[in-house]
Amino acid sequence: MPLQPFHLAVPVHDIAVARAFYGGTLGCAEGRSAAEWVDFDFFGHQLVTHLQAGRKAAPHYNPVDGQDVPVPHFGVVLQWQHWHALAERLRAAGVGFQIEPGIRFAGQVGEQATMFFYDPSGNALEFKTFRDPSRLFAK
């Protein structure tokens, strides 16, 4: 079965700031919108940012491979070269990383490159990649 796009709606504190981050920094094309929400083409998936005035994110962390991973988080598994290009784009834009781009589970079956950062509203994002994409669900 071909992979189907997912739909995810996340709260943001400011629609203009969300447009600048998702549209400008991440390069996601904008779809439909209204005063209180904006659709983005999030790497082939539908991400909707909904205005929630006064939003205060309260992150939680779980240890994974010696690092504190923010929970909840969302993101996409990219091709190797696209992941590296995105990491450089984020660095150039001055985005601060919660977990710097690097390798997790080195030498293990689940070895992957990953990075974590927050959008301006405190939503945690993770982007990851595998040299061999067939290892995504390998045990």
Place the predicted regions along the sequence by residue:
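Vicinal oxygen chelate
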Residues: 1-6, 29-80, 84-118, 130-139
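Short alpha-helical
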Residues: 16-17, 81
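Conserved active-site tyrosine of GNAT-family acetyltransferases
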Residues: 18-23, 90, 122
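Short amphipathic alpha-helical segments
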Residues: 23, 129-130
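Short glycine-/small-residue motifs
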Residues: 124-127
